[in-house]
Each structure stands twice: as C-alpha cells, then as structure tokens.
C-alpha cells in the first residue's frame, strides 16, 4: 500500500511539473509573439504605405488597393539616390573588407597566441563595448584632422575618413575569438606536425570552418556602415561623399506631405540590408549560437 501511495505521489508531481513546464512555454511563446508583432508592424506599414497613392497614404489605410510600384522609381529619381546609394556601397565594401581582415587577425591572436599582457589588453577591448559610439566621434575627428595635416593623403571628404574608423570592431573580435577558442587543439597540433605556422593554420584550417561567425560579422559590419549618418556628416562637407542615409534624411524634408514617396525612399534604403540578411540568415544564426552570445 505504501508503494502505491508513493507511486501516486510521484505521478502527481510529474503532472504538476509538466503543467508548470507547459505554462512556462506558453508564457515564453506569448512574449515572443508580442515582440515579433511589435517589430514587424512598423516595417509592414512602411512597405504598405510605400505602395499606396497619396490619398490612401494620408488616409491611413492599411493595404493599397492597387500597388503603385512606380513610387520606388519616382522616389529614387527625386531623391537622387544614385549618388548616395553607390557611396554607401563603397563605404560598406571598403569598411567591411578591412574589418574582416583586422578583426580576424586580432581575434586569432587573442584566442590562440600567447604574449605578455594578452588578458589585460582583451579586457580593455571589451571595456570599449561599454562606450557609446558618440563618445568616440570627437577623438576620431581630431585624429582624422591631424592625419590630414601630417600625411600627403587627403582624409576629409575622402574614403579613408569614411571607412577606416569602421574597420575596428570590439564586437567582431569578441564573436570571432569565442568561435576560434572552440576549435579543437588537435587541429593545431596536426598543423604543426605538417610544418604550418600561425598564418598558414589560420588561412588553411581556421577560416574554412569559420563561415558562420564570418557571416555574422558581415551582417553587423555591413549594417553599421550602411546606416552610418553622424560620422559621415562630421568628416564631409559635400553631399557628393555622403551615404544613402543622408540622402534619405534630405528627401524626407523635400518630399514633405508625400507620405507614400517618403515611405518608398525608406524601403529603398532598407532593401540592401534585408537582401543580405536573407542570403546569409542561416550562417548568421549559427554564428550567434556558436559564439556563445545567444540569450
């Protein structure tokens, strides 16, 4: 009889635990769904209004009766997006290329090499993640101005000032270092037996298996460079050097009450980032998971 009571008690506990787990999952799903809805609604309205005519957009309709695809061409032409768009492409491409090279080398050094003060330097690097981006604008601007005086290279109103500050990223180094540390030590031992040094090991062994974190860096690096606005305004005086974010800002003022064209300009600005994300989203998610940064 005692065994029956014990079994019954265990069964009740199991049911209570299952009920608790199910309730917890339901709460998590509800929170996630609410978060997704809050994130999606602004994007949905932007796309929807960009396809409306003026009367529909000012009437706050949710869906266009007849999609006006010509709004995108009209917004592109009126905002003169061609100059700003290709400026942003150049800024993002140069910045991202430099970031991948320098951050990969730095992350590998912190993950696999031994040198005096490594942990202290890495701690300082992580501390920079606490700094707001705006805090770095003044010292970077002073540095750029000084380099323009002491070197023959023109920095202001030129690609160096627009791209080099984006090539250093503590966040990128953190992600890559976390991944590099998870690579089995046996691979390094085997590479040493084959006579490989650190550079050959990095190029032939580490990088081929680091596609996921690399794509994560590509997403964050491209998005940061593409969306930059304040820094380009500081180091340029001519619109001919400014990115598409500046073009959108200027167009929002010029378009005035033409809500549909303003939304079309916003979609044009967002499109490259969205396309890139959908191309590499699988590797991006894997990179976040493997880096140990998932929530």
Model-predicted segments: where are they?
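Short, Lys/Arg-rich, polar N-terminal cytosolic tail immediately upstream
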Residues: 1-21
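A structural signal for multi-pass alpha-helical bundles of membrane permease subunits
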Residues: 24-295
């Amino acid at each position: 009889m005692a065994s029956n009571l014990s079994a019954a008690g265990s069964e009740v506990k199991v049911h209570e635990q299952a009920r608790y787990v199910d309730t917890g999952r339901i709460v998590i799903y509800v929170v996630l769904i609410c978060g997704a809805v809050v994130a999606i609604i602004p994007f949905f309205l932007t796309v929807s209004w960009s396809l409306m005519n003026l009367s529909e957009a000012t009437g706050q309709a949710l869906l266009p009766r007849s999609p006006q695809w010509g709004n995108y061409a009209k917004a592109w032409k009126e905002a003169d997006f061609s100059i700003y768009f290709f400026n942003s492409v150049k800024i993002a491409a140069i910045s991202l290329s430099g970031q991948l090279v320098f951050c990969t080398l730095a992350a590998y050094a912190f993950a696999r090499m031994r040198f005096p003060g490594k942990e202290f330097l890495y701690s300082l690097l992580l501390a920079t993640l606490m700094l707001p981006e705006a805090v770095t604008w003044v010292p970077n601007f002073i540095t750029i101005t000084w380099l323009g005086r002491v070197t023959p290279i023109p920095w202001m109103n030129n690609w160096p000032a627009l791209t080099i500050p984006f090539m250093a990223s503590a966040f990128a180094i953190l992600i890559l270092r976390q991944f590099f540390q998870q690579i089995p030590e046996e691979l390094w031992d085997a590479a040493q037996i084959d006579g490989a040094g650190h550079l050959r090991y990095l190029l032939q062994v580490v990088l081929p298996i680091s596609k996921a974190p690399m794509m994560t860096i590509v997403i964050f690096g491209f998005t940061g460079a593409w969306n930059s606005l304040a820094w380009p305004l500081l180091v340029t005086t001519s619109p001919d050097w400014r990115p598409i974010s500046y073009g959108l800002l200027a167009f929002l003022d010029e378009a005035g009450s033409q809500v549909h064209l303003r939304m079309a300009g916003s979609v044009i600005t967002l499109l490259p980032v969205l396309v890139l994300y959908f191309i590499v989203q699988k590797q991006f998610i894997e990179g976040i998971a493997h880096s140990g940064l998932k929530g």
